[in-house]
Amino acid sequence: MTKSALQIARAAYQPKVPAALKGAVKAVDGEYTQSVADQDEIKKLFPNTYGMPVVTFEKSNEKKELPAMNVGVILSGGQAPGGHNVIAGLFDGIKANNAASRLYGFILGPGGLIDHKYMELTADIIDEYRNTGGFDMIGSGRTKLETKEQFDKGLEILKELNIKALVIIGGDDSNTNACVLAEYYKATGAGVQVIGCPKTVSYTHLT
């Protein structure tokens, strides 16, 4: 595909990175959290993940050799700006820590996790989508993760690929999926971290 001068210039742009994430960092636990309302009810629903501390990242002079890790990523719900750059940032981050790390994208949203449809995201693929809009790199979907059978089916492929962290990018419904999945995997000792990344055009995660 022939690229225009604008496309080439746009791809070369380097997004701004917080100072704390430049170079070595350390994670610092802060105060324990609680919901704005209905604390008791929510704690009953999420007994293993409710009330976790705020984590901040600070610069560190300590440099560690980190082991390679495999990470999965899902684009979920309606398209929103920045989805591709979240994936690019994940790729750059895990590769900077250890070049042997791998990033896997699940195709067409949460359904790809359940149906075991995925692709390894390489530098060649990532570079085609840097600084572009849409959720086109791996596609998106609106499958809700809400049953034990779905959770267990997803865990099968996560274990097969030796994935230790799963990032779900989307709006409020998508991050609800992430919460429910994280609670189940924590309760069962699955050994998979689930991270929700807010990404929406409707600001529903702020309401």
What is each model feature region?
Residues L66-V71, N98-S101, T132-F135, L161-A165, ...:
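Short coil/turn connectors at secondary-structure junctions
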Residues M1-M69, A96, E128-R130:
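N-terminal low-complexity/intrinsically disordered extensions
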Residues Q34-K64, L113-K164:
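Glycine-rich oxoanion-binding loops at beta->alpha junctions
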Residues T204-T207:
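Conserved small/polar residues in nucleotide/adenosyl-binding loops
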Residues V86-L90, D173-T188:
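Short Gly/Thr/Asp-enriched flexible loops that form oxyanion-binding sites at enzyme active sites
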Residues S76-G78, F106-G112, R142-T143, G171-D173, ...:
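Short, ordered loop/turn segments at secondary-structure junctions
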Residues M1-P15, E65-I114:
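N-terminal phosphate-binding or glycine-rich loops at protein starts, especially the Walker A/P-loop
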Residues N70-A80, D136-G141, K164-G170:
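Short glycine-rich or small-residue beta-strand-to-loop segments that form or flank ligand, phosphate
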